[in-house]
Amino acid sequence: MPTPTKGARLGGSPSHERLMLANLATSLFEHGKITTTEAKAKRLRPLAERLITKAKKGDLHNRREVMKTIRDKDVVHKLFAEIGPHFADRNGGYTRIVKAMPRRGDNAKMAVIALVTEKTVTAEAEAARGTKFAKDEKAKAEATEAKAEETTETTESTEAESTEAPAEEAKAEDTAAEKKDES
């Protein structure tokens, strides 16, 4: 049994909070992004990330675990068929919270929580930024290229030596044949 978080329950009992977060997660997976209060968005993020991680595994047990939270079968199907495979190469960080302007009626802090659709940062992007990670990767790449060039040079020189020897033998045979013809 998970221990409840300390502090306010987002304006209700623990069961109300649990159901409200389930509804927010359902809307997030259905629409891709939702606008809600900052507090709700911060409470929703760990739940959504956990559900996406279970969807990435994709087995029956995890599908049933997700069905405990999200009651809509269509949303669960979308989560396992589209969203989970989309994040297959990403280890966490599936959602993004962006602060928005306060709500007009009560001036509550608002935020937009959305699923991240961009791919992770590639090596080319790191190289363009000139980060330490990119420099380390560049040094490793240069070292492997140098080793590859050395191995190709040694194989080329070995092949060249083996092709030169028959050429010299062929010249010797040609001169011997010419001498026989002259005599």
Curated annotation (Swiss-Prot):
Gene3D superfamilies: Ribosomal protein L17. SUPFAM superfamilies: Prokaryotic ribosomal protein L17 (SSF64263). Transmembrane segments: none annotated. It comes from the Bacteria. The keyword Cytoplasm does not apply. Part of the 50S ribosomal subunit. Contacts protein L32. This is Large ribosomal subunit protein bL17. It comes from Saccharopolyspora erythraea (strain ATCC 11635 / DSM 40517 / JCM 4748 / NBRC 13426 / NCIMB 8594 / NRRL 2338).
